[in-house]
Structures are given as structure tokens and as C-alpha cells.
């Protein structure tokens, strides 16, 4: 079934959140991987994008994800600092672009950005879009549709939602937000 769905996607079919997500979550993993590989070969070939990230805000995260050193719930020695200045992020992006990186992403610890942090992020993305040729990505936790739209307008082409495990197992690794929160 995954190979048939892969053919449909290659021909332009767009997945529907509810029905297709439930199918993908129940599909045999080997078949799902074969379908995904078919799509990759057809749409991307064997090209590899190099993506570099910058930790835009580190530590003090109020979420309790068991695997994450950024969580304030765990006693780690991770460096803690507030959201970086846009100029610092831009300079780091330029350094990575000079090393032939294709994509660049700001990632931040925490459930979501504050209003002031979102404004800093948007300034950084706009500056990178203006001064660099890399594709821009983001990972800033749980955002509103309005914030996603603002990121897109600022030049962000991909967003990393980081769904770490299955719906069934999610409560075993995190209790401060749900699997469904990640999908909204």
C-alpha cells in the first residue's frame, strides 16, 4: 500500500492530515520506508543537503522530555543563555554558508518563543534571507498558525516539529505536552 501511495504523492497528491496520518502510523515500517525511499529518489535523487543549526536559546526549558539535556527538570551542566542577538546569528550563518552549508536553522529550548524572542528570531531570519543564500529552517517549539505564517514571510522554508516517539509511548517520555500538541 505504501508504494501505491508513494506513486500518488509523486504524481502530486497531497496528504490529508487525519486519514493519511492514521494510515502512516499503522503501516508496516519496511513498506513505509520503501515508499518514502521511492519518493526521495524521484523528487530529490541522491543529493544531500547539509544543514547547520545554532542553539538560539539554551537551557531552562520548562518541559520534562526525558531525553533532553535542555530541560530544567534534569540536572545537567548544559550552558544556559537567553535568545541570541540577530547579528550574532547572522554572522554564524555566514560562517557556515562559507563552508558550503545548504540549510541553516535556529533551534531553541522551550515550549515556545515569547513575543520578544519571536521578534528577534524574525529579525535574524530576515537578515539571513537578505544577506545569505542558504535555505532557512526553524525549530521553536509549539507555535500559533500566525507565528508559522510570520516565519514563512521572513524566509523560513522548513519547520522541525521533532516528534520523538509514537503517540502511545509519548506519555512515557513527556508529561508537560502531548503528542497531539505537536501536531496542531
Annotate the PLM regions.
Residues 47-79, 124-125, 168-171:
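N-terminal small/glycine-rich loop or linker at the start of catalytic domains
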Amino acid at each position: 500500500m505504501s508504494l501505491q501511495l508513494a506513486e500518488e504523492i509523486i504524481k502530486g497528491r497531497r496528504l490529508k492530515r487525519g486519514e493519511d496520518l492514521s494510515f502512516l502510523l499503522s503501516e508496516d515500517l519496511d513498506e513505509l520506508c520503501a515508499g518514502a525511499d521511492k519518493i526521495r529518489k524521484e523528487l530529490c535523487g541522491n543529493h544531500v543537503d547539509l544543514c547547520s543549526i545554532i542553539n538560539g536559546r539554551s537551557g531552562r526549558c520548562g518541559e520534562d522530555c526525558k531525553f533532553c539535556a535542555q530541560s530544567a527538570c534534569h540536572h545537567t551542566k548544559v550552558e544556559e543563555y537567553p535568545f541570541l542577538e540577530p547579528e550574532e546569528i547572522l554572522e554564524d550563518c555566514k560562517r557556515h554558508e562559507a563552508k558550503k552549508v545548504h540549510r541553516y536553522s535556529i533551534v531553541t529550548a522551550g515550549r515556545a518563543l515569547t513575543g520578544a524572542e519571536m521578534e528577534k528570531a524574525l529579525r535574524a531570519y530576515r537578515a539571513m534571507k537578505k544577506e545569505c543564500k542558504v535555505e532557512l529552517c526553524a525549530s521553536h517549539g509549539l507555535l500559533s498558525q500566525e507565528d508559522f505564517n510570520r516565519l514563512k514571510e521572513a524566509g523560513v522554508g522548513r519547520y522541525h516539529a521533532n516528534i520523538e516517539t509514537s503517540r502511545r509511548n509519548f506519555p512515557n517520555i513527556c508529561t508537560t505536552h502531548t503528542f497531539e500538541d505537536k501536531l496542531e
